[in-house]
């Protein structure tokens, strides 16, 4: 028993830390459903007065967010991961729940009409540029590609307008409309050979105060290469030097990637829970360790969420 306890409290080395950390991808979108079946998608809602970005193509309305996360056990001295990952959770705005059918149809039509007008204006401006410039001119190919993108967007919006008009005009069946938000999750890590591995996850629970979520693999199994964090029971919230493990650049459009191997970053933790880890190299969700390699929490803004709070989250 003593040997087992020593093994379970043994600190992680650099390789172990890297195999604890994962990149978490959260895809979120809003749906317009008819009789509980998705028919249209939109980017956001402005209260109960407007829907933004209505479209017939789900990918056009999907928000992608990359954060860090980590495999973790739920008990201090037992291998109790069962495929669970703790990571930040972001709700991409809410949707109004009290709108009746006619109000939803009206907002869908209004959103489509506003978009079509804007896209037509953009198309006219780009068509003029293409008419007066030659293929050899600097930037012509980029403008032509943008024009094609706007054309595709207009087709998707026009299709959305036709769909909602058709459903609303159906005299044989009175459709029930609703708005809802959907999200999918996956994690990306690296196995013992350094190969990139992507695993789909599902949401188990979330805490709105901490803005954290517990995710889990579909079969509740933990990959062989994963090294779950050990939530030791004693307090670790004292001023000290710390190490964080993260894929740099997450959250920065244009440079973020979920396939880059994580790096180890040094910083300091204050007794108040604040840290000085650089956000570019230690984004939200990055696991944090003592210099010796004991897990103590995760980065959440300018604070480090202590492992005792994570333990409470896993018990919900």
What is each of the regions a protein language model found here?
Residues 1-6:
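Hydrophobic membrane-insertion alpha-helices, especially the h-region
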Residues 8-21:
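Ser/Thr/Pro/Gly-rich low-complexity linker/stalk segments immediately outside membranes or between
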Residues 10, 34-36, 51-89, 198-202, ...:
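A conserved glycine-rich beta-strand in the N-terminal activation segment of trypsin-fold
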Residues 10, 64, 194-196, 223-281, ...:
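Flexible, gly/ser-rich surface segments that form the specificity/activation loops bordering the active-site cleft
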Residues 34-61, 98-177:
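Mixed-charge, low-complexity intrinsically disordered segments
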Residues 92-111, 115, 154, 168, ...:
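Active-site loop architecture of trypsin-fold serine endopeptidases
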């Amino acid at each position: 028993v003593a040997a087992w306890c020593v093994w379970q409290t043994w600190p992680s080395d650099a390789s172990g830390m890297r195999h604890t950390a994962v990149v978490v991808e959260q895809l979120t979108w809003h749906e317009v459903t008819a009789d509980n079946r998705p028919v249209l998608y939109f980017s956001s809602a402005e209260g109960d007065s407007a829907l933004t970005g209505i479209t017939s193509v789900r990918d056009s309305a999907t928000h992608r967010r990359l954060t860090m996360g980590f495999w973790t056990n739920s008990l201090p001295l037992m291998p109790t991961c069962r495929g669970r990952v703790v990571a930040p959770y972001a709700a991409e705005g809410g949707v109004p729940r009290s709108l009746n059918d006619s109000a939803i149809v009206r907002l869908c039509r209004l959103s489509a009409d506003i978009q079509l007008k804007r896209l037509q204006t953009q198309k006219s401006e780009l068509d003029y540029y293409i008419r007066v410039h030659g293929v050899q001119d600097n930037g012509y190919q980029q403008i032509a590609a943008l024009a094609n993108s706007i054309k595709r967007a207009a087709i998707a919006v026009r299709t959305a307008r036709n769909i909602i008009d058709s459903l609303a005009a159906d005299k044989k069946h009175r459709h029930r409309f609703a708005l809802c938000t959907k999200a999918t999750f996956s994690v990306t890590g690296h196995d013992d050979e350094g190969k990139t591995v992507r695993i789909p996850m599902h949401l188990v629970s979330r805490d709105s105060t901490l803005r954290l979520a517990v995710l889990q693999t579909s079969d509740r199994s933990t990959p062989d290469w994963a090294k779950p964090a050990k939530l030791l029971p004693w307090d670790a919230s004292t001023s000290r030097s710390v190490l964080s493990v993260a894929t740099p650049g997450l959250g920065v459009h244009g440079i973020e990637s979920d396939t880059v191997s994580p790096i180890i970053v040094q910083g300091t933790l204050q007794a108040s829970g604040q840290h000085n880890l650089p956000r570019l190299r230690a984004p939200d969700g990055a696991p944090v360790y003592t210099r010796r390699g004991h897990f103590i929490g995760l980065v959440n803004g300018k604070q480090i969420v202590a492992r005792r709070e994570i333990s409470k989250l896993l018990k919900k």
